[in-house]
């Protein structure tokens, strides 16, 4: 006679004491489109962007006071380009063939509560091509540290038009 028996006893004890902190990054873009006579003809809004690794690193350096370039009125620029490649965290700026970076308008960026607002004007001779990608950088080119990148088609800017781009980011 062959007798077999199998048995498994398992006891597990654990304490699930964990702290989970989260922060939400909520970007909201706005483009005001003016014709050559400065008549407003369209306002377009969209949400979202991807934080770029180089921008995150620059923010962390600023947070702890190490050497970094601030995203302030002297250094911050909004960039627009015609790139259509999906945003990826490892990118280091705009990817399109045509691109332009414009400095902040006077008094920008601004902070109110938990929201920072960046704003720049693209005048009659600036950025006259398809607008498909957007960024905020701490300099006037892709070699600066780009904070973020958004990809969305907002049409072609015509010679003579002025488009004002604004980004509000709320962190909560």
Where is each model-derived feature located?
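Small cysteine-rich, disulfide-bonded extracellular modules of the LU/uPAR three-finger superfamily
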Residues: 1-131, 138-172
């Amino acid at each position: 006679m062959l007798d077999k028996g199998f048995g498994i006893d398992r006891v597990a004890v654990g304490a699930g004491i964990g702290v989970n902190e989260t922060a939400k990054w909520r970007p909201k873009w706005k483009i005001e489109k003016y014709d050559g006579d400065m008549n407003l003809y369209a306002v377009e809004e969209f949400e979202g962007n991807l934080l770029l690794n180089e921008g995150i690193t620059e923010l962390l350096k600023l947070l702890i006071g190490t050497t970094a370039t601030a995203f302030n009125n002297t250094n911050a620029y909004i960039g627009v380009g015609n790139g259509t490649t999906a945003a990826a965290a490892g990118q280091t700026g705009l990817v399109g063939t045509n691109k332009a970076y414009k400095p902040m308008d006077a008094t920008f960026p601004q902070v109110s509560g938990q929201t920072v607002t960046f704003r720049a004007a693209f005048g009659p001779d600036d950025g006259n091509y398809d607008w498909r990608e957007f960024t905020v950088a701490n300099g006037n080119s892709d070699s600066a540290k780009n904070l973020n990148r958004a990809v969305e088609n907002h049409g072609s800017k015509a010679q003579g038009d002025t488009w004002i781009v604004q980004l509000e980011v709320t962190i909560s």
